[in-house]
Amino acid sequence: KNMITGAAQMDGAILVVSGADGPMPQTKEHILLAKQVGVPSIVVFLNKADQVDDEELLELVELEVRETLNEYEFPGDDIPITSGSALLALEALTENPDTNRTGDPWVKKIYDLMNEVDNYIPLPTRDTDKPFLMAIENVVSITGRGTVTTGRVERGADQVGDNIEIVGLKETRQATITGLEMFQKTLEKSVAGDNVGVLLRGIQKEEVEPGMVLAKPGSITPHKQFEAQVYILKK
């Protein structure tokens, strides 16, 4: 459930596979889910490379990963694959936070991975000119501040002071945005693609729930019937 919710928002993904063990059953599940929910691009990180003494074994794991990606209709032959050790890179950075790509070979591998992400996964086009819309994924109550809804802005933009509508499941409600936060940073404005927490004035936690949306007033209306294409996943 959490994997599907997260993957549905992704513009790209890093598939982490143990270089010592190769693809596991859950690896295939994650690749299938990524394909079904429309993750457009994947890069691969073969972790635990420090535990593999024979370079040929690592090459066999890479070949197996590419074949698995091809099986689920990703371009496995073209997807960049980087090997390294997240643990050893973390230990090097913990010991010396100023370590850069030239200071430690395992840290360099992480830099190499992120370069592949930058080069292979294209920057997405955002619908910033359309009316604001955000699907609510979670709702929390902060003592002394009010109710915060979290989610990814699907289109448009919003800012502190904007009036919005809460639409779906219950009667449509009006609310005012009194705060925006993203990764523990306070914002004045958020735009399409941002994962944000939206603080709402005068709304109780029990009045909103996941599945509802925040929208520009008058831009959308709720419906009780719809047509859908459903994917049934089985083991």
From Swiss-Prot:
Cellular component annotations (GO), alphabetically ordered: chloroplast; mitochondrion
Segments passing through the bilayer: none
Localization terms from the record: Plastid, Chloroplast
Catalysed reactions listed for this entry: GTP + H2O = GDP + phosphate + H(+)
UniProt binding sites for GTP: N47, K48, A49, D50
Cysteine-cysteine disulfides: none
Family per similarity comment: Belongs to the TRAFAC class translation factor GTPase superfamily. Classic translation factor GTPase family. EF-Tu/EF-1A subfamily.
Name of protein: Elongation factor Tu, chloroplastic
Record organism: Bryopsis plumosa (Green alga)
Gene behind the chain: tufA
